[in-house]
Amino acid sequence: MLDGARKLLLDEYYGNREIVAVSPHYAAYADEKYRHSLQVLGAGNFIIRHEPWFAGLGEEFVDLAKTAVLLHDIARFDEIRERFLGAKGPFDHSVAGGEKLRKIPLYGDVRITLPIKHHGHLIGDFYKDEEYCAIADPVLKEEVEKILFLIRDADKIANFNLMMYDQKMLVPLFVPYPEEVSDKRRRISAGVLEDFWRHQPVDRRKIRTRADEMLGYVSWIYDLNYGSSAAFCLRLNLVDMMFDVLQRFHDDSGLNGKMRRETGDFVRERFGFSPLPQS
């Protein structure tokens, strides 16, 4: 199944990139989304290797889980094509991806389609999904949930890594250079801070400033599900690096230091992990 998924991903990437190739912006965006899919699979492989829940589940299940991870952004290429062609309305790539795969028998398993449908949504939307709620088999229901957690964690790790280790991508894909941001865009809004102190991902509807935007990315740490995911982030020093970037947007070392300590305490209290063995 995973080999077929790799071919499907390539077909979607090449087919849509050919259409947008005349636009450097959209062509680069398609290139990045293909790379991102591979990076998310790499992060997912790490989680599967180190997370106890996945141990002993069998090669077939692991292959299915990896397929869901690899194809999580399969509808991004449709979105890029449609934006290039002039579409202006909203495009939910999570929902579109789930529906796209539902029409392909090989990938129509609910353990693939439902996690992809909700990987970019607030977790509460998933738990209220009628299809998820209607699953009677508790084992199947847990597998759907665990694969969703896997995709969400691997996706965050890949984005954290991109933002922190590829600064040229931080600028066009996430936020502009701090030097281009006026003082009024450096403030953190009250509603954003409220979400942060509640240990929940920042509601994007509350974001008003570039500092809000960056703290919103930091707050993703609150949405990690697996201890191995948190350990991976800390091993690469991603959390500290994100706060270093936040300092460039929000010049308040006292508050930034307090928030940095808060996330560290949260990770220790929630996961209580010891460093993972090198592998």
Where do the language-model regions lie?
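Active-site flanking loop/helix segments enriched in acidic
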Residues: 9-39, 75-86
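Divalent metal-dependent phosphate-bond-processing catalytic cores, especially two-metal-ion Mg2+/Mn2+ enzymes
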Residues: 28-63, 71, 80-83, 127-128, ...
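An active-site-proximal "capping" alpha-helix that borders the catalytic cofactor pocket
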Residues: 39-47, 90-105
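His-Asp-centered metal-binding catalytic motifs of divalent-metal-dependent phosphohydrolases/nucleases
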Residues: 60-89, 97, 101, 112-125
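Short, amphipathic alpha-helical segments
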Residues: 88-95, 106-113, 140-144, 148-151
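Alpha-helix capping at helix-to-loop junctions
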Residues: 103-110, 118-129, 156-159, 163
